[in-house]
Amino acid sequence: MPLGPTCGPVLLLGSTWFTVGSTTPVERWVTVERGQPLFLVLVSMIGCLADACMDGEGKCQAGYGVGDEALADYLRDGIRTCNDVSTAELYATVDSHPLGNLFQYRAWSPQPFAWWYPAGSIVAGGDEAGGELPLAVTDGWYLLLAPLSPGEHVVRYGAKCVNPDDPSIWCTAILLYHITVK
């Protein structure tokens, strides 16, 4: 599915819709079936073993090999620390009703995983060929919303993140979904 201002959830897994995140403000319109929960990504960071990290002997510059659990821990610690110091605010509303205590919904991948990315993706530099990263971990804040009642709904969510080295540099992810439940 192409990404653009009007595309909606990218994946239906079982009965759950997984919505597309963004690092810039975006507005989307989607239709879902009655009874389908929605999975929202407030903030997510992926730590992965990129080809640029590898030397000629299959070792990361940090000294770990692809199969080392220590490498997964190293990546996990790095993204966890980055999220800790950079995530300033989280917010989510459903039909103008704020959802509270969002920082309690943090989760991370307990096991490393391989990650495939398509050509033209952010990971691929926008227009390069896609590929697979043999080891990745993730850390962030996620919400699983109970199925919404039939009708029209507005779900707004996102985060404000800051650069701890220069607080004048910050980004705000504002996602606005207009959802029709059939």
Per-region residue spans from a language model:
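N-terminal segment immediately downstream of the Sec signal-peptide cleavage site
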Residues: 1-17, 173, 180-182
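Extracellular-facing segments of soluble proteins and assemblies that are Gly/Ser/Thr-biased and enriched
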Residues: 12-120
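Extended, well-structured beta-strand/loop surface patches
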Residues: 85-150, 156-182
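Beta-strand-connecting loops/turns
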Residues: 35, 150-151
